[in-house]
């Protein structure tokens, strides 16, 4: 995997190439962009570039160091995360900062990757700050977050931010054609619009649309029929779900509503249910519902309980 594997983002890639040519790849990067924007792809490329032993452009993608990075088997790439915890435990951060002073096993750098840096609490960020300020020569931090503002200003000021951008329509469409050769082009184009130009998001939309969740089918029926009592019957059991169970349901509802809205502008609906929504509800209703679910997904990432979120949606989606 070379830098060219990151689609679009030409300005960002030129900047990285210039830093590399000058030997100035920093010790702290902040990679920002929404889920599906390519943050994780860029992180893998950066890890490989920093460990690559080939002359010329790095990463070469074929040397032993690159292969280990790309296979997820490099001993000097440390992922700091606990997917089962909403907030990254401070102990994990402290352990990483202690481990930082043990020299690399075989690589040129020891890289600490934080795939959910936005889920570091203030205490964890302050612990990390001390190591980011004065790392050993081989120490490197890669922090991934949706927005730079999710981290403390003191952290941001010590990192080089690399912001991922949406792909040009032609680039995105070409990539989707390669990945979904049997899907009609109008459907690919509609997925790209709904994804805001981000490849990973568009791929998720196309995969998720292959099957409608039971809660989504029930939601469409209740929403199109304007029956609040039916909507309550859909949302009430969802109040008992865990956050990770509720998120894909609300994400699919959002996708259905967005497709319904864009179909009013001439884009083909991704599912028949989207056309049903577009026929049953006016644009103002659909727009309000999209905003309600956007806020619900935002609250889901905060401290609001699934019960409170579903209760609010019972009122907002009538």
How does the language model describe each region?
Residues 126-143:
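Conserved catalytic/switch belt of AAA+ P-loop NTPases
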Residues 116-120, 132, 148:
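Conserved Walker B
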Residues 1-49, 65-68, 137-139, 146-252, ...:
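Charged, glycine-rich active-site and insertion segments that engage polyanionic ligands
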Residues 2-123, 127:
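Clamp-loader machinery-focused feature within the broader ASCE/P-loop NTPase space
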């Amino acid at each position: 995997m070379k830098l060219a594997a990151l689609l679009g983002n030409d300005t960002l890639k030129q900047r990285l190439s210039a830093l590399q040519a000058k030997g100035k790849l920093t010790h702290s990067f902040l990679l920002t962009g929404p889920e599906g924007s390519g943050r994780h792809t860029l992180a893998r490329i950066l890890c490989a570039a920093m460990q690559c032993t080939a002359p010329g452009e790095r990463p070469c993608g074929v040397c032993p160091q690159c292969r280990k990075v790309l296979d997820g088997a490099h001993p000097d790439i440390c992922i700091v995360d606990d997917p089962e915890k909403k907030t990254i435990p401070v102990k994990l951060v402290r352990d990483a900062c202690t481990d930082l002073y043990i020299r690399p096993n075989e690589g040129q750098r020891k890289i600490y990757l934080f795939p959910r840096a936005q889920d570091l609490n203030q205490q964890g960020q302050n612990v990390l700050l001390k190591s980011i300020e004065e790392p050993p020569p081989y120490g490197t931090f890669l922090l991934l977050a949706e927005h730079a503002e999710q981290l403390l200003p003191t952290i941001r000021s010590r990192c080089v931010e690399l912001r991922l951008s949406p792909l040009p329509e032609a680039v995105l469409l070409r990539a989707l054609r390669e990945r979904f050769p049997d899907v009609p082009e109008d459907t690919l184009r509609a997925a790209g619009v709904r994804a805001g130009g981000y490849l990973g998001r568009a791929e998720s939309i196309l995969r998720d649309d292959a099957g409608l969740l039971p809660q989504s089918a029930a939601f469409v029926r209740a929403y199109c029929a304007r029956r609040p009592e039916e909507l309550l019957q859909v949302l009430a059991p969802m109040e008992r779900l865990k956050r990770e169970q509720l998120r894909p349901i609300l994400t699919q509802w959002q996708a259905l509503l967005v497709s319904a809205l864009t179909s009013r502008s001439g884009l083909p609906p991704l599912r028949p249910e989207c056309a049903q929504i577009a026929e049953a509800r006016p644009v103002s209703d659909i727009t309000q519902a999209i905003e309600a679910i956007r806020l619900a997904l935002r609250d889901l990432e905060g401290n609001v309980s699934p019960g409170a979120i579903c209760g609010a949606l019972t009122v907002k989606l009538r």
